Amino acid sequence: MTEARELRAFNFEVRAEQNEQHGTYITGTPIVFDQETDMGWYTETISRDALKDTDLKDVRFLVGHNTSGIPLARSRNNNENSTMQMTVTERGMEIRVDLDTDNNQEARALYSAVKRGDMSGMSFMFVVDKDSWEDIDTDHPKRTIAGIRKVFEVSAVAFPAYEQTDIQAASDGQPLDSARASLESARRQVEEDRAAQAEAERRRALLERLENLTKEVKDNEP
């Protein structure tokens, strides 16, 4: 079965910095815990323990989710030698991306755009391992993501804010489509569960009726 990958993009603080240890780098927080986000179709919160068992190895850092381009950094084993280091804190998941501005023109352009404030958001692609829904039958349900199985990539994005929501509206509409697909999938599951429960209750009622009829027949035997 194909995994349902989801996109989220937010207007969190992204900083361009430089020091002797890491050279030219950017930092940011693509995932924030316990913060309600209006996804357009529903409200979503990522719980504090959502990254407890998440696979953060071999995550790529891209610009605008451009998977056909060369990654600007990579977490590999997510240690001090990685060009992208991902750290889970009390606030969420923070990243540091070491940029090769000496040899990579796109890295130089990104560093400049972040430093100038032209690039102000981060986005991540992931697969949910565990979630729950409240008020699923209402016009604006609530979703809590309790576990994220895998983060595939993190991107710097130019359009992190969607009108009247906190979700990115890219030209292809992917993040919003992803949110809508998640809600539709949850509602289908609820309907399937209700149908299964109704069928189980129907079978129980039928069995009870047969047992009562059998008892009546036995009671009326001479």
Positions of PLM-derived features:
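Signature of dsDNA virion morphogenesis modules
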Residues: 1-184, 200, 215
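Terminal short linear interaction segments
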Residues: 184-222
